[in-house]
Amino acid sequence: MQKNRNVVWILAGICICSLFLFLGESYFHTKGEPREAVVALAMLEKGNWILPVNNGVDIAYKPPLFHWCIAVCSAVIGTVTEYTSRMPSAIALMAMVMVGYAFFAKRRGREVAFVMALLTLTNFEVHRAGTNCRVDMLLSALMVIALYQLYKWGEKRLRGIPWIAILCLSGAFLTKGPVGMVLPCLVMAVFLWIRGMNFWRIFFSFFGVALASCVLPFAWYVAAYRQGGEEFLQLVLEENVLRFLGKMSYESHENPAYYNVVTVLAGYVPYTLLVLISLFALKYRKVQAKPREWWGRLKAYIRTMDDTRLFSLLSIVIIFVFYCIPKSKRSVYLLPIYPFIAYFLAEYILYLVRVHPVVMKIFGSIMASVSILLLLVFFSLRMGWVPDTIFSGRHAEENRAFMHALETVPLDVVSWFLIGAMLVAVKCFISSLRKKDVRMIHYDVFFIVFTIFLSLDGLFQPPVLNVKSQKPIAESIARIVPQGTVYSYQLNEVKGNPLRQFIVNFYLGDRVVPFYAVSPVQGYMVAEEVEIAVFKEEHPDYRVEEIPIGDYRLRLYQFKKNTE
């Protein structure tokens, strides 16, 4: 018991270091993060926690639980920041990892559960989602925890009421719509049916759970409809029905079926490489059985499969297949399957350590080389050994800006600590290579991967990503227009998916409003040079003057309508 408690504290410490230390180091640089954060900002500033209006005219595209979480985290310090906006995702990932460890430790052993937790935490897709201000990590955590709780309910033969599962399903519904409630129920229902439980008992039991899970979301939907009316109803239909049927009013992340396979393989970097290397170490037998015999063997294997393994397999297969159906596909939709893939991968890694340790040695050597290479490139940039002429083409100027950002980033105590941690991790791995007993070598490899992610979050990525951010533009505009509305003018407006100056709007405190929504007589407007040329053609009755704010693509203009 004491040993298990120590492992829990160690895992919690790893989660905190991996997720919370550098959440706010990178500015918002994509439209997705500030689009969610500004909804929470509108909630706090306008007091509307049901259906707040942001960007002057927009209502949120997703239900409000994620935005409520941001608002609660931000209310503690009195303002919405990059850190507080990303905090709900980090908390959700930590909860998913910790609950997953407890679930698998009880049923499959502490070691496989601990390795599973580390794999979940240190793969590219999950780590990125856990440090971003997007709804997907919260949705995935609630779905996965609901699956664990429904499994525990199934162990009790569906006796009692799974209150925690119902709350998680309600939360998932309030995060991104009914899919968050439907999929966990479907997975568990199929599992119990395969295990021989009566179909109608399963159906009515999960129908009751689904109804109970809809109570809180239904209350919000009613309140939101009273505020938003038909516009809100159309948005709900678009996001939850038409998106699944591929009949949205605009193209949204449309990708072929194989896209999901590619994204999972890419999302599990660096461990995809480990699996690829291991394929050369395995022994293969010639396949002689006919397809009908394969099917019979598969059914027999499933019948004899451990319950936890079958549950994990079904979670992967059903959720994966479900998200292959709609045209709209994104890598983050598949986040709920990552912990279950991690479980099977954990078993596989422990097998490799026992039977083919050379695979872990090769993989660890590659990761150690990547770590050293990162440091060599970083210090080469700082020494000025890389000339600007190395870059050419369309993005040459931006790439040079990235390089100079790394070249001039100040090295403080934290920076040197991160560099030292990378070197220590490599040293520990090299030491383990010299030992005859390699039963713990996988933890040295995890240490290297952990320090790479930590250094990327805290040292290498922020200066590069901050170059892409429009925060300096917003700060320049704020000095000239400290109060009042700033208007925006953008071309190629798409119905249902309008373009907005999300980053600038967030950093200006939700003061940016589309010009067409108000048609003001005078004021300030942000637009690109091409856009302002079109504006002048379409509105010849306006005088427009550029206000210098720096060498940016996005410009600030002062306009006034001619009254003569």
Residue ranges of model-derived segments:
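Membrane-integral, polyisoprenol-dependent glycosyltransferases
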Residues: 1-361, 552
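Membrane-embedded architecture of ER/inner-membrane glycosylation machinery
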Residues: 163, 284-564
